[in-house]
């Protein structure tokens, strides 16, 4: 088909092959880190049943590879379309997994109320990809002690941020359409619970939750490694306070 050759020094792109006219490519360099970000797209035509892709190292035109030449490669996360997956560093053997989940022991991180959780979330979708994409939840807890922070959907709002803990289900419907936000939940000493998203705070209701056993775990980004309730997005600056933050503190936004 065709190739897009990128000069890593000048960032010049040269298209070759029979499909060169159908290839578009772009490249930029992050001067702070030295990484070069490259992207190439080919326009398919009728009759092409399969199109593969690969990354190759090539010496400069007219030159040759010499001892000591090397290049670092990092594959991107593919998080849109029917081929959603996340590639991971795996040594010399290629590997992929359906769901990137961070699992954290709850021991010494969270036990009882009051507490507040805040994090930055970027969801890479506009329509919920499953029943309830998780920002985080818990596993291995005792009956009635589950904690959930994620996104839900209804007839009127698709993708609203919400929390669910001990029968207290709090939503911020107004921010259902946001792709990036600071979101979280707060549980006070008197069990009053609310959800927060980018400066909006839901009304409060009482939870029956009081504590969680120390053998439980916190799961960030999904529910199972099989992809159940996978977020299909990014979570960063995940923070837990062992106190109820004020409305002003909970009202962070990005």
What do the PLM-derived regions correspond to, one by one?
Residues 1-63, 71, 150-209:
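Extracellular glycan-interaction surfaces
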Residues 40, 74-78, 119, 235-240:
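Extracellular beta-strand elements of beta-rich domains used
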Residues 53-59, 129-144, 164-166, 197, ...:
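Aromatic-rich beta-strand patches that line glycan-recognition/binding surfaces
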Residues 54-68, 213-240:
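Extracellular glycan-interaction patches encoded by glycine-rich segments
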Residues 78-111, 128-129, 236-254:
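Extended recognition patches within non-cytosolic domains
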Residues 98-115, 140, 169-175:
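Short surface loop/edge beta-strand patches of beta-sandwich-type extracellular domains
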Residues 109-125, 146-148, 179-185, 235-238:
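A carbohydrate-recognition surface predominantly in extracellular/luminal proteins
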Residues 137-138, 147-153, 162-165, 184-186, ...:
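Beta-strand-rich, repetitive solenoid scaffolds
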